[in-house]
From Swiss-Prot:
InterPro entries: DUF7827, PGF_CTERM, Slg1/2_DUF7282, Surf_glycop_sig_pep. N-glycosylated on Asn-307; this N-linked glycan is a branched trisaccharide containing 2-amino-6-sulfo-2,6-dideoxy-glucose (sulfoquinovosamine). O-glycosylated on Thr residues within the DTPE repeats in the C-terminal region; glycans consist of Glc-Gal disaccharides. Belongs to the halobacterial S-layer protein family. It is found in: Secreted, Cell wall, S-layer; Cell membrane. This is Cell surface glycoprotein 2. Residues 888-899 have a biased composition (Low complexity). Its main location: secreted. Residues 816-899 are annotated as: Disordered. The keyword Lipoprotein applies. Residues 835-850 have a biased composition (Polar residues). Glycans are attached at residues 37, 56, 110, 220, 251, 262, 292, 307, 319, 344, 396, 437, 490, 523, 557, 574, 587, 616, 700, 717, 809, 838, 847.
Length: 922
């Protein structure tokens, strides 16, 4: 008996067979629709508006222009696309129909042809989605090379190998080979066709290919890359994951410009949503903006087609979701700063790009400023900068700003404070708490803000000043080096400054950031240095009474001017090349650097090496717009002549050994971090030489130069002097030097156990005294301990206490060091370099096993108790109990595996049931 479902299935199959019989008269995409026994085997548009239909038989009678209808993108017989003529030979009766259009069809268009008036049966044939080619290659014209972009569809017109295109048959072969002769395509022409459509998508860019038709005619095709790119860009739209209030847009670029391109937006069902046509620009982005799109049809993608070549590219998927209710909040509900500073207020946004912020309250504070924020970069937050120094002035664009990619519009100040403050000379906002609020959206009328917070403006003050020194060639404002990273390298705290070095005044003061910001953004200062000098009064009133509006003052005065004379201040206008300011407003810190070589005082005098100069630097915020109470800090320092002094031995010589790694040291007052040279020159006939090793000044003013004297003989004399940063030889006195037999040392250390607090060196010999240092790991490892000063001589079983106990095994490297500065204190690194032999440090190494001390009573307890208990109890219990318990244990183990076994049986049962059900159905 046939079931109902089988009956339905039979009816469906019967209907499908009947439908397939009639389907022969219905159009087929890209190919054939039948009219009687005639169908289209291939269709192509080529050669600027020529259309070929290759039929499987004759149309019976010639096709005329009136028998042909043209559809472009679904539009019937559009203007400019009329059929101008039908080929007199290939009029359909030969099985080939060729006709010409009034206008070339671009490769990006959809072309459909309907031919009627055929004899016999249904008299209409339709060819849909015809291949529209961008270039035509005539294989018999020997035209040479054809340049094509990868992805173009080409038409290759045949000649059958006999020089006459009419001779092409279905056996005519077309072969495409690469430059190495490898065949990439081998095919034949369709019956009744003289045109072969060839897609270049799979060819390699930069390659040349040879086309052979019928075995004789050749044509070369060179493939280039159009480099058509469709990118989802946050700069022009809102990205790949957006909501229905965001902008859907793409950036399109190509290597060739000037040609139009068609951009089509498709939804998740591949339905066309919108189309735009724009001309592309070579290597420049062109934006296609499709505005807001519905979340219902998400995801979307954009397909862009170059109209001339037909080359296409698609964007990645763009997801559109429904927008939720927008909200805005503050990252921190309470923000604190000082009056006069620039305060950062970070606003966070959800489901919105816009928010309105209010700082202050017109009712409570008599001042409010409002602005509309836009999250242009789509990161969900906008940082607002509020300048309390300029608040209330006419130019409110300096009060509320937004840095970076985000945007700020519709800024407006209100309140009696704004009405009364007409210039920066008048008082700024009072130090107190101000309300702040933010609301999602763009409406300025805020009655119920999303979030309310507090801005606490405290009183400003000058906290401290101290001076640092830097080398004369230091580039203080180098953006690649953080000024704090210089500390300990080439920035050292000191009140003794060598002439030509840089003195850096570190000022810690709050409430001055806003004035500097105003000078840079609105008053023409090119950088923070210009802004600082413009904002601060640098000249006493007795010289110039043009005080600054901010009340900031920086006086740097020479004080050693003698009796009955005023201090001589630096003329900052004439010393502009000497001044550099580096600001750190987040920490209320400002570094004002002065190059002492270029400083000029109001008297016209400069800082010279002929005499010491005493200077008093004072920074203050005077009573005025920024504060009701003045505050200031000062620092005294002295400049002195640059000098260096070499360290000599007891005989008054700079003495080195005839070996590698010899050191020459000295002391100087120039800034630590300065790069000096020590010049050593011998005019000896036997051993003439000039050596100039470099030496870096250390934090304590010492410097050490290291040189190899192993090629020179003991007994050679030389002269030595220290050269300044600029190579100046007058920097130090010239001293006498001599080469003596090289100092020697030996050391021996063995593998050992230790509690980690000390190591024992077996033996050591130091020809000139010094120290034994212990390095961890290898010779370049950290020094973890050193001996006391050792006189010249030999030592055995030398115990060295480590700086910190070691808690695990390590390799100890023993290394003898010299006492190069003669102070009998270990000063390495810097001074006290190691003894060397053949250019390498003298060392020996050993493995140190760190072990804890074992408790004394543990070994005694273990043997007394355990042997006595075990034989008495265990043998009696084991035979009696264990045999009876073991079977139970085995049973329990089997049961423990039961659930897994049951699951396997259940699975088999299910399979069996399924097979039984199938059998019953059959």
């Amino acid at each position: 008996m046939t079931g109902n479902s089988d009956k339905v299935r039979s009816l469906f199959l019967t209907a499908l067979m009947v439908f397939s019989v009639f389907a022969g008269t219905i159009a087929f995409s890209g190919g054939a629709a039948a009219a009687a026994n005639v169908s289209v085997q291939q269709a192509a548009e080529y050669d600027s508006g020529t259309v070929e239909l290759a039929l499987n038989g004759s149309t019976g009678s010639p096709v005329t222009t009136g028998d042909i209808n043209i559809y472009i993108d679904g539009n019937e017989n559009p203007s400019n696309y009329g059929v101008s003529s039908v080929d007199t030979t290939d009029d359909g009766t030969t099985g080939r129909l060729q006709f010409s259009l009034d206008q070339d069809v671009q490769p990006n268009r959809n072309l459909t042809v309907e031919v009627s008036g055929l004899t016999g049966g249904d008299n209409t044939v339709v060819a849909e989605d015809i291949d529209v080619t961008s270039q035509t290659i005539d294989a018999d014209d020997d035209s040479g090379d054809t340049n094509a972009f990868r992805g173009e569809v080409l038409a290759i017109r045949a000649d059958g190998g006999e020089g006459d295109a009419d001779d092409a048959t279905s056996s005519t072969q077309i072969v495409v080979e690469d430059s190495n002769g490898a065949v990439v395509t081998q095919d034949t022409y369709t019956a009744n066709s003289k045109v072969y459509t060839y897609e270049t998508e799979n060819l390699d860019t930069g390659e040349e290919y040879e086309v052979t038709v019928g075995g004789t005619a050749d044509e070369n095709i060179t493939i280039s890359n159009l480099d058509l790119n469709v990118n989802i860009d946050d700069d022009v739209g809102d990205g790949a994951n957006i909501d229905d209030t965001d902008t859907l847009a793409v950036n399109v670029s190509t290597t060739r410009g000037g040609e139009p391109a068609n951009a089509t937006l498709f939804n998740e069902d591949d339905d066309k949503v919108a189309t735009q046509i724009k001309s592309l620009k070579g290597n420049e982005n062109v934006v296609f903006d499709f505005g807001n799109q519905s979340a219902d049809d998400s995801p979307y993608y954009v397909k862009v087609t170059d109209n001339q070549t037909g080359v296409s590219a698609e964007s990645d998927q763009i997801n559109v979701s429904e927008s939720g209710e927008g909200d805005a909040s503050f990252e921190t509900s309470t923000v604190q700063d000082e009056v006069g500073d620039v305060t950062n207020i970070t606003v966070q946004m959800g489901n919105t790009e816009n928010a309105v912020i209010n700082v202050g309250s017109q009712n409570d504070d008599n001042y409010v400023i409002q602005g509309q924020l836009e999250d242009d970069n789509g990161d969900g937050e906008v940082t607002v900068q509020f300048n309390s120094y300029t608040a209330g002035t006419d130019n409110n664009n300096t009060v509320l700003t937004v840095p970076g990619d985000d945007d700020l519009d519709e800024v407006e100040e209100k309140g009696s404070f704004t009405d009364s403050r007409n210039s920066l000379d008048e008082d700024v906002l009072e130090p107190q708490s101000y309300s702040i609020n933010v609301t999602a959206g763009t409406s300025p009328d805020v009655t119920s803000p999303d979030t309310v917070g507090t801005l606490r403006l405290n009183e400003n003050s000058v906290e401290s000043m101290q001076t640092w020194v830097a080398p004369s060639d230091a580039d203080i404002d180098d953006e690649d080096i953080d000024i704090y990273d210089r500390i300990g390298e080439n920035l050292t705290q000191s009140d003794d400054v060598a002439v030509e070095d840089v003195v850096v005044h570190e000022i810690q003061a709050s409430g001055i950031e806003g004035a500097l910001e105003y000078e840079q953004e609105d008053n023409g200062s090119s950088d923070v240095t210009d802004a600082f000098i413009a904002a601060a009064d640098t000249t006493p009133d007795r010289i110039n009474d043009d005080t600054s509006a901010s009340g900031l003052q920086l006086y740097v005065n020479r004080t050693d001017v003698g009796a009955n004379a005023d201090a001589d201040p630096i003329n900052f206008a004439n010393s502009s090349s000497a001044v550099t300011v580096v600001d750190d407003p987040d920490n209320n810190t400002y570094f004002v650097a002065l190059d002492t070589e270029d400083v000029e005082f109001e008297s016209g005098n400069t800082i010279t090496e002929e005499e010491d100069t005493e200077i008093n630097a004072t920074f203050s915020v005077q009573e005025g717009p920024l504060t009701d109470d003045s505050s200031s800090e000062s620092e005294l320092y002295t400049t002195s002549e640059r000098n260096a002094e070499l360290n000599l031995d007891d005989d008054g010589f700079v003495t080195v050994g005839a070996a590698a790694g010899q050191t020459v040291s000295g002391d100087t007052n120039v800034a630590p971090g300065s790069e000096l040279e020590v010049e050593m020159e011998s005019e000896s006939e036997a051993n003439p030489f000039v050596e100039r090793p470099e030496a870096t000044v250390g934090p304590n003013g010492t410097y050490v130069a290291t040189e190899d004297f192993s090629d020179y003989s003991a007994g050679t004399n030389f002269t030595v002097q220290t050269l300044d940063v600029d190579g100046d030889s007058d920097f130090s006195d010239e001293e006498d030097g001599r080469i003596v037999e090289a100092d020697t040392a030996t050391v021996s250390i063995s593998d050992q156990e230790s509690d980690g607090s000390e190591v024992v060196v077996d033996s050591a010999q130091l020809s000139s005294g010094g120290f034994i240092a212990i390095h961890a790991g290898d010779a370049s490892g950290d020094v973890v301990g050193n001996s006391e000063y050792l006189e010249a001589g030999t030592y055995n079983d030398l115990t060295i206490t480590l700086d910190e106990p070691m808690d695990e095994n390590f390799t100890a490297v023993a290394m003898p060091h010299q006492d190069t500065n003669g102070n009998e204190e270990y000063d390495f690194p810097g001074d006290d370099g190691p003894y060397t032999q053949n250019g390498s440090a003298v060392t020996d190494s050993a493995n140190v096993t760190v072990s804890a001390e074992e408790p004394e009573d543990t070994p005694e307890d273990t043997p007394e108790d355990t042997p006595e208990d075990t034989p008495e109890d265990t043998p009696e219990d084991t035979p009696a109990d264990t045999p009876e318990d073991t079977p139970d244990t085995g049973t329990e183990t089997t049961e423990a595996e039961g659930p897994g076994f049951t699951a396997a049986i259940a699975l088999i049962a299910l399979v069996a049931a399924a097979l039984l059900a199938v059998r019953r159905d059959n």
